């Protein structure tokens, strides 16, 4: 269990591989945001530290990638050593308080993801779509005046 991005985040360690979902991204991007429902920057830092305590040779597979401007191709695999040495926000030596301050300040500048409302509706239903309405249409309903 590696909460922080959301309270439900998990990391699966199988042999020399760790599947971290959205907890960590590639070192040149940093970790996940922590401002989603139930997210917590301090819990995220502690989860990342548990991941970074794995052996240096452990391969990390990220859930998705946001290539920065100086990297044109998406990536999906990194290592504990690369994260410790090069992660722009949580490399070795970053204190918990410094990380929490940075993460919370940065999260305040980020817009909500474009698909957050439909994603929340499906997540709340444990991945199930709502029942079909008359005419056999399955619809997600979005509020027009609130998030």
Annotate the PLM regions.
Residues 1-68, 147:
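Catalytic core of the metallo-beta-lactamase
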Residues 46-59, 66-147:
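Accessory terminal helices/loops
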């Amino acid at each position: 269990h590696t909460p922080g991005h959301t309270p439900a985040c998990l990391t699966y360690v199988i042999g020399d591989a760790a599947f971290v979902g959205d907890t960590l991204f590639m070192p040149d991007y940093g970790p996940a945001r922590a401002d989603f429902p139930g997210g917590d920057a301090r819990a995220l830092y502690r989860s990342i530290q548990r991941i970074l305590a794995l052996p240096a040779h452990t391969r990390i597979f990220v859930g998705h990638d946001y290539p920065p401007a100086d990297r044109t191709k998406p990536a999906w695999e990194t290592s504990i050593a690369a994260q410790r040495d090069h992660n722009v926000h949580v490399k070795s030596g970053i204190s918990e308080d410094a990380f929490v301050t940075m993460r919370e300040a940065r999260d305040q500048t980020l817009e909500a993801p474009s698909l957050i409302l439909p994603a929340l509706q499906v997540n709340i239903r444990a991945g199930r779509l709502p029942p079909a309405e008359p005419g056999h249409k399955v619809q997600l309903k979005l509020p027009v005046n609130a998030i």
